[in-house]
Amino acid sequence: MTGDNLVSAYVSDAERDVEASVRPRRLAEFIAQERVRDQLDLLLQGALRRGSPPDHILLSGPPGLGKTSLANIVAAELGTSIRVTSGPAIERSGDLAAILTSLGEGDVLFIDEIHRIARPAEELLYSAMEDFRVDVVVGKGPGATAIPLDVEPFTLVGATTRAGLLTGPMRDRFGFVAHLDFYSPADLETLLHRSARILGVPITGDGAVEISGRSRGTPRIANRLLRRVRDFAEVRADGVVTREAARAALLVYDVDALGLDRLDRQVLTALVDLFRGGPVGLSTLAVAVGEQPDTVEEVCEPFLVRAGLLARTPRGRVATEAAWRHLGRTPPNGIFGSDAPPASDLFSVEPDQP
């Protein structure tokens, strides 16, 4: 993975195996997300005592926070098999029917990016979730016949990064809905020490602190940065992941102290230097950094907005005072966000309790 997407929260095909090696296997091993963990434990323990599958589970939240890990943990805690697929892979209702009819009793079906499932397949899923049966249409036109097929009782675990795109009928069929939050630096440090033990990487406390602060509150990014710092430590240092090794390695990979990469800084620099902080339209900003508007909007902006470095306004994108200071510039008086808290405190605030 190149330095330009080292801090992407999405997983590449090349790193799936190594990511799986550090994935927690049981609920007790899952770090952070205490509320979700406790609620899920009650759901699963209750189902085990009754001897019946638990309600269908919907997990939402940004990528890289552990939705796939939790789906595998559900199957492990129940002692059943898991079948994994994704919304984009289910193009026809027949594809889904084949998967559903192959499930054993109590199995877990995990559908990642469930908001992208095709509408005919989604409608077929409704009856499977509620009545454990599907109607498969054979033939076309007036001669078409619907053949009912029974499905073994199962638990659907759906994962989505865009819960707002789920239809109402789909969302209503999940008995358990949970949202995963970004991790605090302390939780990421705990996770890094665990991953380092599994990978056999010597790491110091301040080394974990340095990496966690650049991980955007995302475990997937933290583990990826750990592997890159490990490479640096083994090749150019004494093999131990220290604060100094982490800083030197991430300087090579162009990841700064806030976790911004080259493209993130290009967006902020263009806003500040070319457009005097904005406001500027998305298309114009994308042209200025040589990227597609979708790339700027979907890859860069979510973290920049959350970090308090960029604001979306009705007139366009605006750099906040924190962005000016992060780039080492002096912000003009009266700039947008001049009263905003420092960006470095982004993930150190505990989430609000209900």
Swiss-Prot record:
CDD domains: AAA. Residues 257-354 are annotated as: Head domain (RuvB-H). It comes from the Bacteria. The keyword Nucleotide-binding applies. This is Holliday junction branch migration complex subunit RuvB. PANTHER family: HOLLIDAY JUNCTION BRANCH MIGRATION COMPLEX SUBUNIT RUVB (PTHR42848:SF1), PTHR42848. Belongs to the RuvB family. It comes from Salinispora arenicola (strain CNS-205). It is found in: Cytoplasm. Mg(2+) binds at T68. The gene is ruvB. It holds the Pfam family AAA_lid_4. ATP binds at R23, G64, K67, T68, S69, E130, D131, F132, R173, Y183, R220. Its EC number is 3.6.4.-. Its main location: cytoplasm.
